[in-house]
């Protein structure tokens, strides 16, 4: 169920689907995804598919975790990354093994509490958590070299653009329903460059009262 061979099959599939960053693939290989899903779904943890984690949220497909992480790191190592949507904590755990510090915002407190426990179990101690509205980012600790958003926004939140450091990279799904696109936004000297990448499907990025 969680054997090394099962994990190796997943890594081979991700490689065949186009992931190429050896460090990202190695981190996905060694990160125990079965710890981030309900015990009843642990037998599916190393399938390349999103899985429900409760509260109308999902743990992202491993390919998408790898894809977004590769995009974030494409220009080189990052020391300060903001994650919008802690969720299960799986993407957080992958990032924590690849960058110096992760600042993770989640609006559903029970999900974030579980994620904290999982990361502590894995001795990943370079993550700072905040229970809050992801649309607002985390201005007090910005700016950030990288920002990754794990839910689809109707449009790019201005607060996230404001909190992106010069040269910083924002990876975010944008759109509603079945019409969503993954964007890479880079803060340049005189503005932002936007690159439209893949068609994707994420749960919506909510705002308003916290849960």
From Swiss-Prot:
Catalysed conversion reaction: [protein]-L-isoaspartate + S-adenosyl-L-methionine = [protein]-L-isoaspartate alpha-methyl ester + S-adenosyl-L-homocysteine
Broad EC category: transferase
PROSITE patterns associated with the record: PCMT (PS01279)
Annotated GO biological process: methylation; protein modification process; protein repair
An example molecular function term from Gene Ontology annotations: protein-L-isoaspartate (D-aspartate) O-methyltransferase activity
Gene3D superfamilies attached to this UniProt entry: Vaccinia Virus protein VP39
Matches recorded under Pfam families: PCMT
Any one Gene Ontology cellular component term annotated for this protein: cytoplasm
Location of this chain's protein in the cell: Cytoplasm
UniProt-listed InterPro entries: PCMT, SAM-dependent_MTases_sf
Keyword Transferase: yes
Catalytic residue positions: 60
Keywords: Cytoplasm, Methyltransferase, S-adenosyl-L-methionine, Transferase
EC number per UniProt: 2.1.1.77
Family: Belongs to the methyltransferase superfamily. L-isoaspartyl/D-aspartyl protein methyltransferase family.
UniProt-listed NCBIfam families: pimt, PRK00312.1
Primary role: Catalyzes the methyl esterification of L-isoaspartyl residues in peptides and proteins that result from spontaneous decomposition of normal L-aspartyl and L-asparaginyl residues. It plays a role in the repair and/or degradation of damaged proteins.
HAMAP family, sorted: PIMT
Name listed for the protein in its UniProt record: Protein-L-isoaspartate O-methyltransferase
Species lineage: Bacteria, Pseudomonadati, Pseudomonadota, Gammaproteobacteria, Pseudomonadales
Name of the gene: pcm
């Amino acid at each position: 169920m969680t054997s090394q061979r099962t994990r190796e099959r997943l890594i081979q599939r991700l490689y065949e689907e186009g992931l190429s960053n050896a460090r990202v693939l190695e981190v996905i290989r060694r990160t125990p995804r079965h710890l981030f899903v309900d015990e009843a779904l642990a037998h599916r943890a190393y399938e390349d598919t999103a899985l429900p984690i409760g509260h109308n949220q999902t743990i992202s497909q491993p390919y998408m975790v790898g894809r977004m992480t590769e995009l974030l790191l494409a220009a080189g190592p990052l020391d300060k990354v903001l994650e919008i949507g802690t969720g299960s904590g799986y993407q957080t755990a992958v990032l924590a093994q690849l960058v110096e510090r992760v600042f993770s915002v989640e609006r559903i407190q029970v999900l974030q509490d579980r994620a904290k426990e999982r990361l502590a179990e894995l001795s990943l101690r370079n993550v700072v958590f905040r229970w809050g509205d992801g649309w607002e980012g985390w201005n007090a600790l910005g700016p950030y070299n990288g920002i990754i958003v794990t839910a689809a926004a109707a449009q790019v939140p201005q607060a996230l653009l404001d909190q992106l450091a010069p040269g910083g990279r924002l990876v975010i799904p944008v759109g509603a329903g079945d019409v969503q696109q993954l964007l890479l936004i880079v803060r340049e000297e005189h503005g932002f460059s936007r690159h439209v990448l893949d068609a994707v499907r994420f749960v919506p990025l909510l705002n308003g009262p916290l849960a």
